[in-house]
Amino acid sequence: MSSIEERVKKIVAEQLGVKEEEVKNEASFVEDLGADSLDTVELVMALEEEFETEIPDEEAEKITTVQLAINYINENLA
């Protein structure tokens, strides 16, 4: 597992109050992990802070699963 993947999963678990082992790559933040709209905003903010990047709102709306978050970070930190 890449360190980015591990860090994203840790943040998701902390922000959404779920166990890290429940955070699967294909998991949807809303449907599988029980996030609401406020949770998703806070999650994006936590990812921005962790990876010292800014995620534009139009991109943040597309990040709906753990894997999409990992992909976004990988593509935009390079």
From Swiss-Prot:
Chloroplast in keyword set: no
Main location: cytoplasm
Cellular location(s): Cytoplasm
Gene Ontology CC: cytosol; membrane
Gene3D superfamilies xref list: ACP-like
UniProt-recorded Gene Ontology molecular function terms: acyl binding; acyl carrier activity
GO annotation (BP), single: lipid A biosynthetic process
Residue positions where O-(pantetheine 4'-phosphoryl)serine is found in the record: S37
Pfam families given in the database record: PP-binding
Protein's pathway: Lipid metabolism; fatty acid biosynthesis
Record SUPFAM superfamilies: ACP-like
Alphabetic keyword roster: Cytoplasm, Fatty acid biosynthesis, Fatty acid metabolism, Lipid biosynthesis, Lipid metabolism, Phosphopantetheine, Phosphoprotein
Sequence ranges assigned to domain Carrier in this UniProt record: 2-77
Post-translational modification: 4'-phosphopantetheine is transferred from CoA to a specific serine of apo-ACP by AcpS. This modification is essential for activity because fatty acids are bound in thioester linkage to the sulfhydryl of the prosthetic group.
Task of the protein: Carrier of the growing fatty acid chain in fatty acid biosynthesis.
Family membership: Belongs to the acyl carrier protein (ACP) family.
Protein name: Acyl carrier protein
Annotated organism of origin: Saccharophagus degradans (strain 2-40 / ATCC 43961 / DSM 17024)
Gene designation per UniProt: acpP
